[in-house]
């Protein structure tokens, strides 16, 4: 399923699956399916601070990104998925990016991601997806720790 998650799945499971799908559609460079995971009034905040509002504009924005850039692929670790209300959930994760033609993450691209999902008409959609650079200013040990955790996750994914 590429357009959200059904009400049948437990909420936290459905939200984790929605997050998995957003990364998968990015990794496949599929702007259409990426945008369809958002609510019609959903918002995207990119790693560079760009803000895009609305499902159609998100799709158009990513079409341009994918046409003009060789985007790296994601590896991630979910740190939290919890309900904020009956039909609203929050997911937080750490993410690394593996540049094209490389087999290791680029630590300069590590990010903390936040996703707010809403259930509408029985389907989970993304209301907000935000990427924040994991700079950890003046705390290089945290940056190094995150990089090692993401590398371990990448190695695990490569094996399995």
Task: Identify the function of each model-found stretch.
Residues 38, 95-97, 130-133:
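Short beta-strand segments enriched in hydrophobic/aromatic residues
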